[in-house]
């Protein structure tokens, strides 16, 4: 049973997803299913990004490859998926976080103006 609905914003996630090998796409789908179905999602799959106003990262690991997909909650039911990237360093790159915050703000502005 779903406790939240996963939705995407524009084409950002779809573009990232389409570029990934099938094994990575399968793992992403598995984790998104967990996020949809579990009320309290473990931090190994979904983690708040410190210093942001509500931005989270979906955490995907396949062997030694680590991927992050930015998202946020709209109300308490929706996780909106933004951009994604393959993580190559210990810390999430600041530029990637800034891009995701910009997209999150853009989403809320469009929602407010009824242009979503």
Predicted stretch roles:
Residues 82:
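ATP-dependent carboxylate-activation loops
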């Amino acid at each position: 049973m779903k406790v939240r609905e996963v939705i995407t914003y524009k084409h950002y996630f779809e573009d990232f997803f389409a570029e990934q090998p099938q094994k990575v796409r399968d793992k992403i789908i598995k984790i998104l299913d967990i996020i949809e179905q579990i009320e309290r999602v473990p931090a190994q799959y979904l983690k708040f990004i410190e210093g942001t106003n509500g931005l989270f990262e979906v955490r995907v690991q396949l062997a030694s490859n680590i991927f992050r997909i930015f998202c946020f909650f709209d109300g308490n039911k929706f996780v909106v998926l933004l951009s994604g990237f393959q993580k190559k360093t210990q810390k999430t790159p600041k530029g990637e976080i800034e891009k995701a915050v910009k997209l999150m703000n853009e989403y809320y502005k469009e929602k407010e103006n009824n242009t979503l």
